[in-house]
Amino acid sequence: QVMPFMEVYERSVCQTREMLVSILDEYPSEVAHLFRPSCVTVLRCGGCCTEESLTCTATGKRSVGREIMRVDPRQGTSKIEVMQFTEHTECECRPGSTVNNGKRKKNPKEGEPR
């Protein structure tokens, strides 16, 4: 099945979208605990901008709570608690670092023998 151009375009633009984030990525100091689930959904900015020099950037944020089970394997205990996560509310394409597949773009002459 082929998705029509306008639907492809509308889905790809810079906007908030539901994404999974790892709790340990958001709370790296909590490595002594296990979390269930280990990731949560939050709205985050993502998508393509019309120019490569622009980056889809959050221009509005808020804190949202998610109930998570925190397990302490050393003590054999667990409890459900509310943890806070940053959620994006607005996005814009703004000038930013030029990134290509997670790596900085190299100057064409960089790394070449002189």
Swiss-Prot record:
GO biological process, one term: vascular endothelial growth factor receptor signaling pathway
Keyword Secreted: yes
UniProt keyword Disulfide bond present: yes
Stretch list, region Disordered: 92-114
Gene3D superfamilies xrefs: Cystine-knot cytokines
Annotated positions of the Pyrrolidone carboxylic acid modification: 1
Keyword annotations from UniProtKB, A to Z: Disulfide bond, Growth factor, Pharmaceutical, Pyrrolidone carboxylic acid, Secreted, Toxin
InterPro entries named in the record: Cystine-knot_cytokine, PD_growth_factor_CS, PDGF/VEGF_dom, PDGF/VEGF_growth_factor
Domain of life assignment: Eukaryota
Disulphide bridges, residue numbers: 14-56, 45-91, 49-93
Tissue expression summary: Expressed by venom gland.
A Pfam family assignment: PDGF
Subcellular location: Secreted
Gene Ontology CC: extracellular space; membrane
UniProt signal peptide: none
Recorded GO MF terms: chemoattractant activity; growth factor activity; toxin activity; vascular endothelial growth factor receptor binding
Assembly mode: Homodimer; disulfide-linked. Interacts with human VEGF receptor 1/FLT1. Interacts with human VEGF receptor 2/KDR.
Family the entry assigns: Belongs to the PDGF/VEGF growth factor family. Snake venom VEGF subfamily.
Task performed by this protein: Snake venom vascular endothelial growth factor (svVEGF) that may contribute to venom dispersion and prey subjugation by inducing vascular permeability and hypotension. Induces an increase in capillary permeability after intradermal injection, as well as a drastic hypotensive effect after intravenous injection. The hypotension is mediated by nitric oxide (NO), which is produced by VEGF-activated endothelium NO synthase. Induces angiogenesis and migration of human vascular endothelial cells in vitro.
Protein name: Snake venom vascular endothelial growth factor
